[in-house]
């Protein structure tokens, strides 16, 4: 679990996300509280429960982006999922306990990657021996093997093709056991049943350099204790897991609607025990959800947070409102973040040998058009900038391979020429922008 301070988390998020200081503070405090709880001892540690968060704000203001960036910072099992994917237990569809099964799989992969690094040196030696076996045969003399080992380490043989035996992945078709739907153990892979028994292999023809990664992973997995790995992954989920539940406003039952809706109120009821704390059975073992942090988010355009079940509202005690984006925010989004849209397009065109030069008045014009279209058609926040940029740079993107070595100056006049009329015509922009 990461031990960086809330201030450092906020400054890291500031590199990629413009504004929304309240939301950044809330998630940074929640993340730090995970670490604080780990420092406690005795029964008090079990009593400290995470304070789940509800983010409320219009679409395209940074709710999902905060979650994405938080996942990279957290160094903990993280799952982002849409609430609309689920149906009430007993109906065809995914039940909410699948959230826990999915985050356990994420944690197992994370833990395996971390542990592979610990045994990488031994795995590399074992992989090297297998490559040498493929090159000179298992019965070659020590002198021959040493000679080839030197050439192998110098990179001389990287492009040489060899045949290696590799383990087949434990995939295969998935099915559910009748009478035991996803609520019990989830879909079972045939590989889970038969894969461990025979240890099936297949012969593959690869270059030496391509074979290394596959063989190192295989040899690493042989050195790992799979039971211990699973236990560590489950412990990581139970203590540090973070679930980002997007589109929670879409499962609200709005006033005046009647009739059954299996993916709305029923899903809310099923979420209650999961967020409050329950034990979920997975194929890897039982997982307790008491200390998993849930961050829910929704635009709440039509529904209101008060349309959620009162019990669910009580389980999301921290409310954070994200502000709608202003013209100044949109202007900053175009230029300030490390991976801003303008930097992305400049880098993309640079691969074709075309230099894009954006002037300040072009940035102003792009922001003005995005604001104008958002106000007349539908406010989709910063996502509108992508549509506007694509439209402005459409001609350059198409002709770039023929313009190698050119420098294209993008100013306000260029922007207006390519998109100005569309932005003014509300009917056209409704369909094109």
UniProtKB/Swiss-Prot annotation:
Sequence positions that bind ATP: 18, 60-65, 246, 311, 383
Keywords of the record: ATP-binding, Chaperone, Cytoplasm, Nucleotide-binding, Stress response
Xref: Gene3D superfamilies: 1.10.8.60, P-loop containing nucleotide triphosphate hydrolases
InterPro entries with a match to the protein in the record: AAA+_ATPase (IPR003593), ATP-dep_Clp_protease_ClpX (IPR050052), ATPase_AAA_core (IPR003959), Clp_ATPase_C (IPR019489), HslU (IPR004491), P-loop_NTPase (IPR027417)
Role summary: ATPase subunit of a proteasome-like degradation complex; this subunit has chaperone activity. The binding of ATP and its subsequent hydrolysis by HslU are essential for unfolding of protein substrates subsequently hydrolyzed by HslV. HslU recognizes the N-terminal part of its protein substrates and unfolds these before they are guided to HslV for hydrolysis.
Family: Belongs to the ClpX chaperone family. HslU subfamily.
Subunit details: A double ring-shaped homohexamer of HslV is capped on each side by a ring-shaped HslU homohexamer. The assembly of the HslU/HslV complex is dependent on binding of ATP.
Name used for this protein in its record: ATP-dependent protease ATPase subunit HslU
Species of origin: Nitrobacter winogradskyi (strain ATCC 25391 / DSM 10237 / CIP 104748 / NCIMB 11846 / Nb-255)
């Amino acid at each position: 679990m990461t031990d960086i301070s809330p201030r450092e988390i906020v400054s890291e998020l500031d590199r990629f996300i413009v504004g929304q200081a309240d939301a950044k503070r809330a998630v940074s405090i929640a993340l730090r509280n995970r670490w604080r709880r780990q420092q406690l001892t005795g029964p008090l540690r079990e009593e400290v429960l995470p304070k789940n968060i509800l983010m409320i704000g219009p679409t395209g203001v940074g709710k999902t982006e905060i979650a994405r960036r938080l996942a990279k910072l957290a160094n903990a099992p993280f799952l982002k999922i849409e609430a609309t994917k689920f149906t009430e237990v007993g109906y065809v569809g995914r039940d909410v306990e699948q959230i826990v099964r999915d985050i356990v799989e994420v944690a197992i992969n994370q833990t395996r990657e971390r542990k592979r690094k610990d045994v990488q040196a031994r795995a590399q030696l074992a992989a090297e021996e297998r490559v040498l076996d493929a090159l000179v045969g298992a019965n070659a003399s020590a002198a021959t093997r040493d000679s080839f080992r030197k050439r192998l380490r110098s990179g001389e043989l990287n492009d040489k093709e060899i045949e290696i035996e590799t383990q087949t992945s434990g995939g295969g078709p998935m099915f559910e056991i009748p009478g035991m739907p996803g609520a019990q153990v989830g879909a079972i892979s045939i590989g889970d049943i038969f894969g461990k028994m025979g240890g099936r292999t297949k012969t593959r023809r690869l270059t030496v350099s391509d074979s290394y990664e596959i063989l190192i992973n295989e040899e690493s997995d042989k050195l790992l204790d799979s039971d211990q790995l699973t236990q560590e992954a489950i412990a990581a989920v139970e203590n540090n897991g973070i679930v980002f539940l997007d589109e929670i406003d879409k499962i609200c039952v709005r006033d005046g609607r009647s009739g059954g809706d299996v993916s709305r109120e029923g899903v809310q009821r099923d979420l209650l025990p999961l967020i409050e704390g329950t034990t979920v059975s997975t194929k890897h073992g039982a997982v307790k959800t008491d200390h998993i942090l849930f961050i829910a988010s929704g635009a709440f355009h039509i529904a209101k947070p008060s349309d959620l079940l009162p019990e669910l509202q009580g389980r999301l005690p921290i409310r954070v409102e994200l502000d709608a984006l202003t013209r100044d925010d949109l202007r900053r989004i175009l230029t300030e973040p490390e991976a801003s849209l303008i930097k992305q397009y400049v880098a993309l065109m640079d691969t074709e040998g075309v230099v894009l030069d954006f002037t300040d008045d072009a940035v102003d014009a792009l922001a003005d058009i995005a604001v104008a279209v958002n106000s007349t058609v539908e406010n989709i926040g910063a996502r509108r900038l992508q549509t506007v940029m694509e439209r402005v740079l459409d001609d350059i993107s198409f002709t770039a391979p023929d313009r190698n070595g050119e420098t294209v100056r993008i100013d306000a006049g260029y922007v207006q020429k390519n998109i100005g009329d569309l932005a003014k015509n509300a009917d056209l922009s409704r369909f094109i922008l």
